[in-house]
């Protein structure tokens, strides 16, 4: 039986947003002074929940496994480029839909894209922290390859890829919208994130997992106005139109996703957001201090000046960087992503592949 990325969520009677009670609370507060906006947002929500979905994207074959993680092959030829997605959302943002898949496109451009699929943890995995994900899942997948790859990490996956590039010989490293200097989220945002974690931590401890609803709540709080406004806009789209299908694909991705292990979630909130260990030069993995300045390979960071999820100020500050104004997700699947991200990324990957 072939795997699909969206099987359980896709078959739900309603499609979110998750957590729905919080979404409705935000909707009420954001539209408190405008009955017209509230009606439009509710109409958009209803249309989203009732819209027909295409069949879920089929997962590509795995060429290597390590525990619950796997390395999925997108074909192509040339140097292997291992894409490391975030632990927080599903990996298929990099393979969102036919015609809007960075990985499928790169496979036609002279590189061999491979995607890390972190799998679905269970309560028995509660003690697997972020360092475990690197040492016991990511590094063995890299070791299974016949040659050193280029690493490309998106969002928190870029943070993890930085560590992997410090622990294994690689041809190059690209980080895309990846946080590193967490203190630069600012005191207000970090305090709100800390309060959210303190409220959720006891239940997560009991579960042994951090459900995606906990993480989604944090994302929404970063930009509640946009969270509601996009459903107002969706209400105006013709059902089945290209913009409507694109919205459904992206929102279904944002509302899907496996939980984090308890330890990975706790470390993200406590060691990264609160303690800023990466940005403070105090993050050690397998006895190695992870410092961007010590990378022994070509490295590029792509960041967005309009990113609310990972503000540009939180980037590592690599010597080679490109600043764009496409938004956190728009860098990967937006209307200008191919021209402004995909094509320059391809050019950089091909150049790095020939660097001795």
Describe these PLM feature segments.
Residues 295, 301-303, 307:
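Short beta-strand/loop motif that positions the catalytic acidic residue
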Residues 1-27, 146, 160-260:
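Alpha/beta-hydrolase-fold enzymes
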Residues 127-144:
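Alpha/beta-hydrolase active-site loop
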Residues 152-161:
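Gly/Ala-rich beta-loop-alpha elbow adjacent to hydrolase catalytic centers
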């Amino acid at each position: 039986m072939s795997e699909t990325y969206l099987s359980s969520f896709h078959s739900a009677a309603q499609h979110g947003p998750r957590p729905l009670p919080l979404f409705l609370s935000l909707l009420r507060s954001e539209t408190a002074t405008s009955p017209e906006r509230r009606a439009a947002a509710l109409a958009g929500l209803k249309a989203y929940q009732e819209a027909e979905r295409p069949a879920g994207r089929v997962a590509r074959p795995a060429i290597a496994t390590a525990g619950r993680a796997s390395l999925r092959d997108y074909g192509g030829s040339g140097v292997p480029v291992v894409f490391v997605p975030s632990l927080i959302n599903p990996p298929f943002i990099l393979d969102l839909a036919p015609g809007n898949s960075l990985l499928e496109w790169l496979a036609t451009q002279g590189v061999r894209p491979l995607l890390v699929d972190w799998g679905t943890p269970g309560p028995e995995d509660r003690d697997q922290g972020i360092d475990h994900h690197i040492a016991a899942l990511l590094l063995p997948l890299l070791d299974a390859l016949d040659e050193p790859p280029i690493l490309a990490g998106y969002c928190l996956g870029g943070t993890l890829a930085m560590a992997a590039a410090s622990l294994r010989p690689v041809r190059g490293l690209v980080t895309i919208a990846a946080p590193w200097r967490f203190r630069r989220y600012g005191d207000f945002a970090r305090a709100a994130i800390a309060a959210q974690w303190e409220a959720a931590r006891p239940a997560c401890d009991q579960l042994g997992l951090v459900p995606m609803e906990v993480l989604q709540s944090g994302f929404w709080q970063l930009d509640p106005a946009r969270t509601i406004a996009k459903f107002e806009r969706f209400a105006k789209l013709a059902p089945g139109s290209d913009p409507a299908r694109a919205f459904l694909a992206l929102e279904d991705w944002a509302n899907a996703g496996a939980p984090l292990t308890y330890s990975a979630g706790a470390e993200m909130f406590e060691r990264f957001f609160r303690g800023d260990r990466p940005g403070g030069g105090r993050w050690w993995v397998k006895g190695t201090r992870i410092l961007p300045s010590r990378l022994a390979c070509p490295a590029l960071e792509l960041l967005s000046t309009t990113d609310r999820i990972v503000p540009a100020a939180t980037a590592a500050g690599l010597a080679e960087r490109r600043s764009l104004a496409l938004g956190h997700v728009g860098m990967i699947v937006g209307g200008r992503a191919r021209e402004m991200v995909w094509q320059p990324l391809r050019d950089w990957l091909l150049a790095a592949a020939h660097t001795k």
